[in-house]
């Protein structure tokens, strides 16, 4: 049992690639939580995708025991959080369990937009934020400039910020000492009725639902009967403990501590994230104010290639949803693709990762349609509807006003690339709101249509600024504009999954570019294939895929039968990823061609 005064709960927040996960590895190593032979890079990034891409997607918690030079032993509960803008909701959830946060800034690159956004989130939640300069052993570091930037842009005192190298471990011991002094101990009465917050939940095939909780007051023991406020269900605690980073069963969690609970909950919705847990004997305890519900920004249709996989796909989405509260889905049908789901995501990276996890972890073959944002439509009769799928748009003569979502974008960019970035924002129909010079960096604030931001704006921003610009955005408002729906017809049949909503001024260009792109992607058939783009009944672009006869065995002559079988099976595998539309086969790439039309 650790006294409250000796517990420290904190998160690590930073921009992508500023060294959060590496610093977490050093903490684990220095506190002796893992043997040297068990150490590996990114210990806390448990998903294969996280390791391959070198990013953190899920926040992970670890309990470490640190022996301070003053002779005291401290329990450090720390949570490693994601840095990418798509996963900022994970950060706000983690911060709800902490009293303090370490803001890790790369001493060579300086402050970036996501650090600013996450830092403001921490300050809003009443946390103490401590700046840390990382990568101090690089030859190109400029600590004085970066300290000035932290003070100018974020507004926290950074003169005494610890300087560390998470890679080599330099200065990390001093950081641990400073952290214990700086971050306040938690408060809470261990004898009061139980009140605990669910920070995260995930599904384990053997144990059921595993919940990560922060105990605000009271004590949870093995065998206790717990009451979950929102579902009003009671469950018996089977196992309780902390991650060190391996699960360690301690049998008890007390006020101020962060740990896991397994209570044999089999229903996926049985332990919602952000909910409050108490004892079944005291069900009237107040709910802890949770986190704000996040709303998806991007919607896309996902359809199984094999229609028999539909139920398997539904189960996979339900299991992912418990672990990822921001994933939204509802059943959807498409004339071209059959039955599937309309899914909502926080951004393009989030969408890619969900698709990759579905294909890897649940062995599904999926076709994804081009993503779209939510539009607000005022109909002629005055009613307002929200449309996230171009194919569900009312007829043009029934629309009074077409409103698109606008994102408030905060961009930090070195002065050298300011011109390029402003040109890009204006190309994307952006309107400048503010511009501030802060040392070598410039803070730009633009209002840009959300549809332009979520597609490939982030990638383009990185390329025009050679990777130096950084972006944070959030939804600002709906605004009236001249938007039209462009349909794609293949041999005269509309393909609902290829429809897109674009600005009137770009409609002809985008329609023609899409038709040309589709011509490259649709394989030649036994007959001519006409591809047309249309607004209403007016055709704005056309191209034709010429007919051919495709014979994969033509070059085999006599040959061995196994060689012929190999060629035929290769052709069959290619066809599996295609769907019949009328009488034309369309590959997956064609459904995403909408994205590549620039």
From Swiss-Prot:
<dbReference type="InterPro" id="IPR000640">
    <property type="entry name" value="EFG_V-like"/>
</dbReference>
<feature type="domain" description="tr-type G">
    <location>
        <begin position="5"/>
        <end position="187"/>
    </location>
</feature>
<keyword id="KW-0342">GTP-binding</keyword>
<dbReference type="GO" id="GO:0097216">
    <property type="term" value="F:guanosine tetraphosphate binding"/>
</dbReference>
<dbReference type="InterPro" id="IPR031157">
    <property type="entry name" value="G_TR_CS"/>
</dbReference>
<dbReference type="InterPro" id="IPR005225">
    <property type="entry name" value="Small_GTP-bd"/>
</dbReference>
<dbReference type="InterPro" id="IPR000795">
    <property type="entry name" value="T_Tr_GTP-bd_dom"/>
</dbReference>
<dbReference type="GO" id="GO:0003746">
    <property type="term" value="F:translation elongation factor activity"/>
</dbReference>
<comment type="similarity">
    <text>Belongs to the TRAFAC class translation factor GTPase superfamily. Classic translation factor GTPase family. LepA subfamily.</text>
</comment>
<keyword id="KW-1003">Cell membrane</keyword>
<dbReference type="Pfam" id="PF03144">
    <property type="entry name" value="GTP_EFTU_D2"/>
</dbReference>
<dbReference type="GO" id="GO:0045727">
    <property type="term" value="P:positive regulation of translation"/>
</dbReference>
<feature type="binding site">
    <location>
        <begin position="17"/>
        <end position="22"/>
    </location>
    <ligand>
        <name>GTP</name>
    </ligand>
</feature>
<keyword id="KW-0472">Membrane</keyword>
<dbReference type="InterPro" id="IPR038363">
    <property type="entry name" value="LepA_C_sf"/>
</dbReference>
<feature type="binding site">
    <location>
        <begin position="134"/>
        <end position="137"/>
    </location>
    <ligand>
        <name>GTP</name>
    </ligand>
</feature>
<keyword id="KW-0547">Nucleotide-binding</keyword>
<keyword id="KW-0378">Hydrolase</keyword>
<dbReference type="GO" id="GO:0005886">
    <property type="term" value="C:plasma membrane"/>
</dbReference>
<dbReference type="InterPro" id="IPR035654">
    <property type="entry name" value="LepA_IV"/>
</dbReference>
<dbReference type="InterPro" id="IPR035647">
    <property type="entry name" value="EFG_III/V"/>
</dbReference>
<dbReference type="GO" id="GO:0003924">
    <property type="term" value="F:GTPase activity"/>
</dbReference>
<dbReference type="Pfam" id="PF00679">
    <property type="entry name" value="EFG_C"/>
</dbReference>
<dbReference type="InterPro" id="IPR004161">
    <property type="entry name" value="EFTu-like_2"/>
</dbReference>
<keyword id="KW-0648">Protein biosynthesis</keyword>
<dbReference type="InterPro" id="IPR027417">
    <property type="entry name" value="P-loop_NTPase"/>
</dbReference>
<dbReference type="Pfam" id="PF00009">
    <property type="entry name" value="GTP_EFTU"/>
</dbReference>
<keyword id="KW-0997">Cell inner membrane</keyword>
<comment type="function">
    <text>Required for accurate and efficient protein synthesis under certain stress conditions. May act as a fidelity factor of the translation reaction, by catalyzing a one-codon backward translocation of tRNAs on improperly translocated ribosomes. Back-translocation proceeds from a post-translocation (POST) complex to a pre-translocation (PRE) complex, thus giving elongation factor G a second chance to translocate the tRNAs correctly. Binds to ribosomes in a GTP-dependent manner.</text>
</comment>
<dbReference type="InterPro" id="IPR006297">
    <property type="entry name" value="EF-4"/>
</dbReference>
<dbReference type="GO" id="GO:0043022">
    <property type="term" value="F:ribosome binding"/>
</dbReference>
<dbReference type="Pfam" id="PF06421">
    <property type="entry name" value="LepA_C"/>
</dbReference>
<dbReference type="InterPro" id="IPR013842">
    <property type="entry name" value="LepA_CTD"/>
</dbReference>
<dbReference type="GO" id="GO:0005525">
    <property type="term" value="F:GTP binding"/>
</dbReference>
<protein>
    <recommendedName>
        <fullName>Elongation factor 4</fullName>
        <ecNumber>3.6.5.n1</ecNumber>
    </recommendedName>
</protein>
């Amino acid at each position: 049992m650790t006294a409250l005064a000796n517990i420290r709960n904190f998160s690590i927040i930073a921009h992508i690639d500023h060294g959060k996960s590496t610093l977490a590895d050093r903490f684990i190593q220095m506190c002796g939580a893992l043997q040297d032979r068990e150490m590996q890079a990114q210990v806390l990034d448990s998903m294969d995708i996280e390791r391959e891409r070198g990013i953190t997607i899920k926040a992970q918690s670890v309990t470490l025991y640190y022996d301070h030079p003053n002779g005291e032993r401290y329990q450090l509960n720390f949570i490693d959080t994601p840095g990418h803008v798509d996963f900022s909701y994970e950060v706000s959830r983690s911060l709800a369990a902490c009293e303090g946060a370490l803001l890790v800034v790369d001493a060579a690159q300086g402050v970036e937009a996501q650090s600013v956004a996450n830092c403001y989130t921490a300050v809003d939640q009443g946390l103490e934020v401590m700046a840390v300069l990382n990568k101090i052993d690089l030859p190109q570091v400029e600590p004085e400039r970066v300290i000035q930037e932290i003070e100018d842009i974020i507004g926290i005192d950074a003169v005494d910020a610890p300087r560390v190298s998470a890679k080599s471990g330099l200065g990390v011991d001093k950081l641990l000492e400073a952290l214990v002094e700086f971050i306040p101990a938690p408060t809470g009465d261990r004898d009061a009725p139980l009140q605990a917050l669910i920070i995260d939940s995930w599904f384990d095939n053997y144990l059921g639902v595993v919940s990560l909780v922060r105990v605000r007051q009271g004590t949870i023991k093995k065998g206790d009967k717990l009451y979950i406020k929102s579902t009003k269900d009671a469950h018996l605690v089977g196992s309780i403990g902390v991650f060190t980073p391996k699960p360690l069963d301690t049998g008890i969690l007390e006020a101020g501590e962060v740990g896991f609970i397994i209570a044999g909950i089999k229903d996926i919705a049985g332990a919602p994230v952000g909910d409050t847990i108490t004892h079944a004997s005291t069900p009237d305890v107040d709910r802890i104010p949770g986190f704000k519900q996040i709303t998806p920004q991007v919607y896309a249709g996902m359809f199984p290639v094999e229609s028999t996989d539909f139920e398997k796909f539904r189960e996979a989405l339900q299991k992912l949803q418990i672990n990822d509260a921001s994933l939204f889905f509802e059943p959807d049908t498409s004339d071209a693709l059959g039955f599937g789901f309309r899914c909502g995501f926080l951004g393009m990276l989030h969408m890619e990762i969900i698709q990759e996890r579905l294909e890897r972890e649940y062995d599904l073959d999926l076709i994804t349609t081009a993503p779209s944002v939510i539009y607000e439509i005022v109909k002629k009769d005055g009613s307002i509807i929200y449309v996230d799928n171009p194919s569900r748009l009312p007829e043009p003569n029934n629309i009074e006003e077409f409103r698109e979502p606008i994102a408030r974008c905060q961009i930090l960019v070195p002065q050298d690339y300011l011109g390029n970035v402003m040109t890009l924002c204006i190309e994307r129909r952006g309107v400048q709101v503010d511009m501030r010079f802060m040392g070598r960096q410039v803070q730009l604030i633009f209002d840009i249509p959300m549809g332009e931001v979520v597609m490939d704006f982030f990638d383009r921003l990185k390329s025009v600024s050679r990777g130096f610009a950084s972006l944070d955005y959030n939804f600002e408002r709906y605004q009236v504009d001249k938007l039209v729906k462009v349909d794609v017809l293949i041999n005269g049949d509309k393909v609902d999954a290829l429809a897109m909503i674009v600005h009137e001024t770009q409609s002809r260009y985008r329609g023609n570019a899409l038709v040309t792109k589709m011509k490259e992607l649709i394989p030649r058939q036994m007959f001519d294939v006409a591809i047309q783009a249309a607004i209403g009944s007016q055709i704005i672009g056309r191209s034709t895929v010429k007919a051919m006869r495709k014979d994969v065995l033509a070059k085999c002559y006599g040959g061995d039968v196994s060689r012929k079988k190999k060629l035929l099976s290769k052709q069959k595998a290619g066809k599996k990823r295609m769907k019949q539309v009328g009488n034309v086969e369309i590959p997956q790439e064609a459904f995403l061609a909408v994205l590549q039309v620039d």
